[in-house]
Amino acid sequence: MQTPKFRLFAGPNASGKTYVFKKLRKGNLIPKEIYVNADKIEAELEKKRKFYFNSYRVRTNEEEFRSYVLRSGLFREKINDENFPDQFSVRSGVLKVRKDVQVNSYHASFVATYLAEKLFESRQSFAFETVMSHPSKLEFLRIARNVGYKTYLYFIFTDDLNTNLARVQLRVSDGGHAVSPEHTLARAPRTFKLLPRAFALADSAFVIDNSNEARLVLKKENSILYRAERIPAILRKELASIVRSFSGTVREISN
């Protein structure tokens, strides 16, 4: 049986994670795997009030989903309302949100992370997109390795967070989802801080500067670390930490 693959696409809001994923897939650099994106799930829940777990070839039921929500760290830290799970129902693999409920990012986050758990159970290859501003997102890489997946990290960033803020505004003007400047700026340092740990957990890892045209600045593959000559200042500290702690061969990549 072929080894399943888990790909984590991480980075600050509006760094271009979905763009890089689509570019890699279009170039046949990664296969056409399931892509779990909480933003797209939120949009689907807002529009249809439904999410079709059964279209992902996973089995679920309402009791199991409720139990997952109640034991999650997100529920304990951000919600802690025992009536919150009543906003959902699950029948025949289809999740529905009550009509009187205003869908938000928490609803989408529960669906996305639960779907990831079920995909691991069914040993399907898939990719997951996250800002990775909380240590809990590192658990995906740990779980994947523990259950026999080959793991990949794609960390996408820009060299100036003002670029991210401008992209959010452009996305909203095109009908996309909004993220407040305060949230974008507050999350980014936490995301950067977690990069060395995520890099170490992944079997293969790629750090991509997506300020303009996507540019690879650090890569780990086959126990060799490749680093670019030009390292953006915004991530210099974290990337230096990765290089110092790497025990294998380090080589330069020119770009």
Cite the ranges covered by each PLM segment.
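Phosphate-binding P-loop
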Residues: M1-P4, K118-F120
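Short hydrophobic/aromatic beta-strand immediately N-terminal to the Walker A/P-loop
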Residues: F6-L8
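The conserved Walker
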Residues: P12-N13
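Walker A/P-loop
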Residues: T18
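The feature captures the helix immediately C-terminal to the Walker
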Residues: F21-K22
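Conserved substrate/cofactor phosphate-moiety recognition/catalytic segment
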Residues: R25-E121
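A glycine- and Lys/Arg-enriched "phosphate-lid" helix/loop adjacent to the NTP-binding pocket
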Residues: N146-L194
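NTP-dependent small-molecule kinase module
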Residues: F199-N255
